[in-house]
């Protein structure tokens, strides 16, 4: 089990942000079903990317890993052999996308996973696919992995709950490729920027669809042509570096390169929010410049950048006023229940943080070094790392292998910016720390 030992430290310097996971996975998928050979430059190398690659190879796609790009020849015939098993690994995108894709085939397809995906809900997507005529059978409890899917989907209309954007994204993919026409309505849509990213890919590939408010219609049976695409930097990953730069005691700024501010990624809005709250952030070409600075808290709607909940919770501990992070219920169904996970771990550091029905209440408070756990969630692990860098005393974060999911060189990049983080593969513990004052919650909402 990998653990981080982190001493208080500040960052400054210049760094290239790693490629976007969301764009990488969609690029690999669409190249695998496209007609011809596609080139994907700067794809993120991660366990989720590998899970997508292996799943797409079972479609018949030929995927070659070059030094700077992926060369992907799409499957000549969009079929899956009888009794194919797709292992989604720990990737929610592979899990949801291939569940929907399996529904277009007339052969039984089995979807399986790593144990971590067992907690990720799938029922709303399955129910929508059943309305199109797909059937599902389960080895255990209904709506739990592993399960088998038998299509094909038939044309029609369905509705899907919008709590998680991946349900609608998966439906859009299946409706594009299956023999249609199809239409669906998203009920109470959340995480709109992430579904917008899926629609951006449809537009980029020339796949037709029509939109009327939250209802989407597809002609179906549309395979894109091969394409060339360069994956830009990941704003979700950049958020952790930005937080470290804002809280830094260094007199120098940090330059985050490889970030296209015109990218559709939803988490870029976090940078505009922080600037609005008083953070000293400037945008220059494909670089975001972060100056150490103070900023206020506030009432913050998390839906536009739900993946930023853990790191924004950390930042709010250092704000000049209280914060209410709301509209964040979907964060409970990620790799962990992020509302509970970040609350439990930051409370170990002395944070004034409480969960509420749809988010978090946070009062500014000093943080102290502590022993913490990642909950096997990459965003929790990275958020706690940034908190530990700005706490009083050393900290340990256990079970941090999960960081490879989106940011494989996270520690290497931070240490290149002058931090003091050590990786250990054996059990480590902190020496007894100085006693700290008890923290009392002040105020409520």
Swiss-Prot record:
Short name of any one Pfam family annotated for the protein: EPSP_synthase
SUPFAM superfamilies assigned: EPT/RTPC-like (SSF55205)
EC code: 2.5.1.19
The keyword Transcription belongs to this UniProt entry's keyword annotation: no
This protein's UniProt keywords: Amino-acid biosynthesis, Aromatic amino acid biosynthesis, Cytoplasm, Transferase
CDD domains: EPSP_synthase (cd01556)
Residues of the active site: 307
Catalysed reaction equations from the record: 3-phosphoshikimate + phosphoenolpyruvate = 5-O-(1-carboxyvinyl)-3-phosphoshikimate + phosphate
Cell location: Cytoplasm
Any GO BP annotation: aromatic amino acid family biosynthetic process
Pathway the protein takes part in: Metabolic intermediate biosynthesis; chorismate biosynthesis; chorismate from D-erythrose 4-phosphate and phosphoenolpyruvate: step 6/7
Binding site for phosphoenolpyruvate: 21, 92, 120, 166, 338, 379, 405
InterPro entries: Enolpyruvate_Tfrase_dom, Enolpyruvate_Tfrase_sf, EPSP_synthase, EPSP_synthase_CS, RNA3'P_cycl/enolpyr_Trfase_a/b
EC supergroup of this enzyme: transferase
A cellular-component GO term for this protein: cytoplasm
Keyword Transferase attached: yes
Binding site for 3-phosphoshikimate: 21-22, 26, 165-166, 307, 334
Family membership: Belongs to the EPSP synthase family.
Subunit: Monomer.
Stated role: Catalyzes the transfer of the enolpyruvyl moiety of phosphoenolpyruvate (PEP) to the 5-hydroxyl of shikimate-3-phosphate (S3P) to produce enolpyruvyl shikimate-3-phosphate and inorganic phosphate.
HAMAP family xrefs: EPSP_synth (MF_00210)
Protein name: 3-phosphoshikimate 1-carboxyvinyltransferase
Species name: Chlamydia abortus (strain DSM 27085 / S26/3) (Chlamydophila abortus)
């Amino acid at each position: 089990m990998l653990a981080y030992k982190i001493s208080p430290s500040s960052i400054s310097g210049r760094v290239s942000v790693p490629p976007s996971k969301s764009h990488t996975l969609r690029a690999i998928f669409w190249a695998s079903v496209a007609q011809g050979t596609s080139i994907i430059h700067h794809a993120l190398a991660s366990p989720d990317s590998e899970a997508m690659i292996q799943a797409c190879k079972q479609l018949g796609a030929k995927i070659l890993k070059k030094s700077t790009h992926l060369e992907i020849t799409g499957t000549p015939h969009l079929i899956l052999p009888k009794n194919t098993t797709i292992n989604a690994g720990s990737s929610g995108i592979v899990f949801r996308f291939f569940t929907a894709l399996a529904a277009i085939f007339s052969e039984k397809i089995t979807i399986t996973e790593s144990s971590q995906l067992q907690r990720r809900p799938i029922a709303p997507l399955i129910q929508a696919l059943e309305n199109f005529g797909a059937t599902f059978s389960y080895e255990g409890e209904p709506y739990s992995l592993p399960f088998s899917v038998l299509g094909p989907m038939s044309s029609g209309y369905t509705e899907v709950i919008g709590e998680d954007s991946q349900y609608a994204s998966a439906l859009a993919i299946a409706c594009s490729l299956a023999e249609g026409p199809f239409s669906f309505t998203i009920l109470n849509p959340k995480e709109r920027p992430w579904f917008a990213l899926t629609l951006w890919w449809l537009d980029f590939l020339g796949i037709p669809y029509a939109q009327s408010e939250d209802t989407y219609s597809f002609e179906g049976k549309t395979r894109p042509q091969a394409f060339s695409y360069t994956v830009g930097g990941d704003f979700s990953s950049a958020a952790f570096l930005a937080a470290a730069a804002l809280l830094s005691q260094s007199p120098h700024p940090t330059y985050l390169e490889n970030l296209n501010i015109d990218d559709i990624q939803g988490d870029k809005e976090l940078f505009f929010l922080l600037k609005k709250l008083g953070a000293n952030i400037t945008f220059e070409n494909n670089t975001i410049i972060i100056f150490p600075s103070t900023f206020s808290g506030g009432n913050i709607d998390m839906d536009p950048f739900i993946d930023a909940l853990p790191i924004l919770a950390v930042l709010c501990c250092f704000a000049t006023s209280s914060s209410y992070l709301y509209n964040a219920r979907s964060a409970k169904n990620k790799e962990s229940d992020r509302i509970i996970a970040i609350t439990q771990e930051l409370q170990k550091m002395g944070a004034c943080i409480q969960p509420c029905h749809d988010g978090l209440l946070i009062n500014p408070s000093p943080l102290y070094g502590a022993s913490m756990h990642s909950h096997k969630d990459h965003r929790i692990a990275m958020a706690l790392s940034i908190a530990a860098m700005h706490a009083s005393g050393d900290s340990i974060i256990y079970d941090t292998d999960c960081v490879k999911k989106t940011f494989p060189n996270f520690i290497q990049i931070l240490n290149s910016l002058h931090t003091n983080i050590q990786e250990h593969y054996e059990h480590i513990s902190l020496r007894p720390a100085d006693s700290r004052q008890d923290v009392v919650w002040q105020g409520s909402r």
